């Protein structure tokens, strides 16, 4: 049976085990790991695949033998797979999910302006996908030239 789970620091709010129990026949556990224990967990952890959440989406990268092109571009990993040789492969599924939603929305965004509200972790993924699909991307954040006080000019 595959051993899967969610890696993060504080996971008490997660519904992931219940969701995955409905999806398939594999073990899915929450792995709450302190930052100072991350290296030992990744190199010796008893898992086959993990979803990765804050604060480890960037921190796991040095432990990956290989990254998918999108994970490399974004500098963010939210899926880890332990290969048969024991090495870790890092990927970012958020980009695929967001691209799927955009493509299936029925709206062609190529050549159109897209406003991204916020510049946190998910923002980089959204920006990359929108740009890849041909949109002109503007990021609105709390500070900087394009911010919430002048949103109306967009």
Where in this protein do the model-derived segments appear?
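Short, hydrophobic beta-strand segments that form beta-sheet elements in well-ordered domains
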Residues: 6-7, 31, 136-142, 154
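Phosphate/diphosphate ligand-binding glycine-rich loop within oxidoreductases
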Residues: 2-105
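Residues that mark the start of a beta-strand
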Residues: 1-3, 112-113
């Amino acid at each position: 049976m595959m051993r899967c789970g969610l890696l993060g620091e504080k996971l008490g709010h997660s519904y992931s085990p219940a969701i995955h129990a409905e999806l398939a026949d594999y073990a899915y556990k929450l792995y709450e790991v302190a930052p100072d224990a991350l290296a030992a967990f990744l190199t010796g952890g008893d898992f086959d695949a993990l979803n990765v959440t804050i604060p480890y989406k960037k921190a796991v990268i040095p432990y990956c033998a290989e990254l998918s092109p999108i994970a490399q571009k974004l500098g963010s990993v939210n899926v880890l797979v332990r290969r048969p040789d024991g090495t870790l492969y890092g990927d970012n599924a958020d980009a695929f999910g967001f691209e799927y939603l955009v493509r299936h929305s029925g709206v062609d965004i190529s050549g159109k302006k897209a406003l991204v509200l916020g510049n946190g972790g998910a923002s980089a993924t959204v920006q990359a996908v929108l740009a890849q699909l041909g949109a002109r991307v503007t990021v609105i954040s709390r500070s900087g030239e394009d911010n919430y006080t002048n949103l109306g000019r967009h």
